[in-house]
């Protein structure tokens, strides 16, 4: 697990399957950034999702935070986990506000790359399919470009701190999610997912560099 530093943060690049990378990390005692690589196409379900079956060739795992499913493909998403210990100046007790600062980091990174982005500061807006598909709804701290969600954020909190899991879309097919999850009506669901989320027109390397540069 290569380790380095980005300002006040420890930076690690863990290896393993998507399931292994979603495993608990133990007590959170320092600011930590985990840059995760997707090794195989994987559908990641929210903690409360059940009864989902997909075609062969796509793994299915469950994360420890809520929300809808996310499809991870190699090269299709920049997946970064940000860990903040309880008591840190970035710690926010109010869950509805706790991701705002992180959304602003992503928005600033995108601005450096010439992309105007907006951080959602309102309540969770799941829409019709947000309970099934993460990128079908929008929650606090998540980032929209041109009105379409491009960076999703979920969080898992315990006594030691918070683990924020961020997914910046580098590729997106709402119709594929409709097919994988069997959403109906098919045309309506596909149109909603296609218009509600969008891939960023950039590569992961420059985006990660800009993101790390804006971490407080």
List the model feature ranges, each with a label.
Residues 92-107:
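A short mixed-secondary-structure module that forms the rim of ligand-binding clefts
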Residues 116-145:
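Beta-rich nucleic-acid/ligand-interaction surfaces
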Residues 71-84:
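DPxDG-like acidic metal-binding loop motif
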Residues 1-56, 61-63, 69, 83, ...:
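Active-site loop/lid in soluble adenylation, ligation, and acyl-transfer enzymes
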């Amino acid at each position: 697990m290569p380790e380095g530093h980005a300002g006040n943060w420890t930076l690690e690049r863990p290896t393993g399957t998507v399931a292994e990378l979603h495993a608990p990390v133990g007590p959170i005692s320092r600011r930590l950034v985990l840059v995760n690589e997707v090794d195989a196409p994987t559908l990641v379900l929210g903690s409360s999702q059940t009864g989902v079956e997909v075609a062969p060739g796509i793994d299915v795992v469950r994360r420890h935070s809520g929300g809808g499913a996310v499809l991870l493909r190699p090269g299709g998403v920049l997946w970064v986990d940000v860990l903040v210990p309880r008591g840190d100046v970035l710690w926010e007790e109010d869950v509805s506000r706790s991701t705002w600062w992180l959304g602003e980091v992503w928005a600033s990174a995108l601005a450096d790359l010439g992309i105007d982005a907006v951080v959602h500061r309102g309540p969770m807006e799941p829409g019709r399919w947000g309970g099934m598909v993460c990128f079908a709804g929008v929650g606090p701290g998540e980032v929209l470009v041109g009105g379409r969600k491009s960076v999703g954020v979920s969080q898992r909190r315990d006594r030691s701190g918070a683990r924020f899991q961020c997914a910046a879309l580098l590729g997106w097919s709402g119709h594929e999610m409709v097919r994988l999850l069997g959403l109906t009506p098919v045309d309506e669901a596909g149109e909603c997912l296609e218009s509600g989320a969008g891939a960023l027109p950039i590569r992961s390397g420059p985006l990660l560099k800009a993101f790390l540069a804006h971490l407080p």
